[in-house]
Each structure stands twice: as structure tokens, then as C-alpha cells.
């Protein structure tokens, strides 16, 4: 079975379409498009071990998050940076 030019073009276009739609990120380097994420939880991690406890709590949710303790109201907030 011979591969025709038409089949080759169809395969190439399908390959380009699939590869362009696979990698979608909320952050594009160099352009400055960024969607920050912040979610606050109970103050328990902050009460147990301070900022380090909050940091460890957020890292269990996702390795990309950082934790910070807030005082008004008392909460452990996980944010992206």
C-alpha cells in the first residue's frame, strides 16, 4: 500500500492539530498572562506549626502551591506564585 501525498498531508495536519491542543497552560512565559489562584482554609495548620505548617499543608494539595498564614481572619491560605 503506497502512501499518497493526500494521506501524508492529512496525517501531518492531524498531527499538528493534536500537538497544538495537548499543551494548554494558564501561564504563558514572556507574555505575562497569568491566573493567580488563592484558596483559604481553617487556621489549624498555622496554629500547629506556624507558616511552615501552612506551607506543608498547601504542598499536600499541590506541589505548586505556597502557604501563608493570615491574621484577619485567622486562616491558612494556599496561593500560586
Swiss-Prot record:
Q: Which UniProt keywords apply?
A: Antimicrobial, Disulfide bond, Fungicide, Plant defense, Secreted, Signal
Membrane-spanning parts: none
Q: Where in the cell is it found?
A: Secreted
Signal sequence bounds:
1-24
The protein's superkingdom reads Eukaryota
Q: List the disulfide bonds.
A: 40-78, 46-69, 54-76, 58-77
Q: Does the keyword Glycoprotein apply?
A: no
Location, primary (coarse class): secreted
Give the UniProt record's GO annotations in the biological process aspect: defense response to fungus; killing of cells of another organism
* Gene Ontology terms: cellular component: extracellular region
UniProt lists the family membership as follows: Belongs to the DEFL family.
Q: Protein name, please?
A: Defensin-like protein 115
